[in-house]
Structure formats: structure tokens, C-alpha cells
Design a protein with these regions (language model features):
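Short, low-order "capping/linker" segments at domain edges
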Residues: 91-98
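A short, glycine/Asx- and small/polar-enriched loop/turn
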Residues: 46-49
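An amphipathic, aromatic/His-enriched active-site/gating alpha helix that lines ligand/cofactor pockets
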Residues: 28-37, 54-88
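Active-site-flanking beta-strand signature of metal-NTP-handling nucleotidyl enzymes
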Residues: 1-9, 51-53
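Short beta-strand micro-motifs enriched in acidic
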Residues: 42-44
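Short amphipathic alpha-helix segments
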Residues: 20-29
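Short hydrophobic/aromatic beta-strand element in the GNAT-like acyltransferase core
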Residues: 3, 38-39
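Short, surface-exposed ligand-recognition loops at beta-strand->loop->(often short) alpha-helix junctions
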Residues: 9-20
């Protein structure tokens, strides 16, 4: 299984909007419950840098673009960014969830 790690830094004046939009996005994920997806969002200590970790099970097409709130978040993020996002592919070596 692979993962996408995305690091984004937003302009400080948009941080509250980002946080509100992240909550709306996760509410939509809870409603839609897409299978085979692990999606996590983190805010770093500086308050303006965010990490997203996306894992999609092998053999599954990414279902997130079919969710309107995900598309809206992606579109709005373009205007909130202070710098281009940094995406990186990662290989999952272990993943424990209780």
C-alpha cells in the first residue's frame, strides 16, 4: 500500500477558514464513508502548515473526487496557499490502529 503525504502552508489570515473547511470535509467523509480510504489531516505547531496523509487500498480508484466537499476544499485551498503544496509518495511499512 502506498500513501500520499501532502504538506501545505497557508497564509495566516486563512488558517481559520482552512480549519472550518477541514471540519466540513471530514463531516462529508463520515456521511459518505468511502471504502478503502484512510485520510488524516494534521496542523503543525506553527499554526499555518498542514499535513494530509491519504492511503487508498490497492486496486481501488480514489473515491474522494466524487465528494463535492472534497472538490470544494481542493478548489478553495488554491487561494489559501502561501506557497505551492509539497506532495510526496510514501510506502507504508506499518500501520497500527486500535
Amino acid at each position: 500500500m502506498t500513501a500520499m503525504v501532502l504538506r501545505s502552508t497557508v497564509r495566516s489570515e486563512y488558517a481559520p477558514e482552512v480549519e472550518t473547511a477541514v471540519k466540513a470535509l471530514f463531516a462529508a467523509l463520515e456521511r459518505h464513508r468511502p471504502r478503502g480510504v484512510r485520510y488524516a489531516s494534521y496542523r503543525l505547531a506553527d499554526g499555518v502548515t498542514y499535513l494530509v496523509v491519504l492511503q487508498i487500498e490497492d486496486g481501488i480508484d480514489n473515491p474522494l473526487p466524487a465528494i463535492a466537499e472534497f472538490r470544494e476544499f481542493q478548489e478553495n485551498l488554491k487561494g489559501w496557499l502561501a506557497a505551492p503544496p509539497i506532495p510526496e509518495q510514501a510506502t507504508v511499512l506499518g500501520d497500527y490502529r486500535s
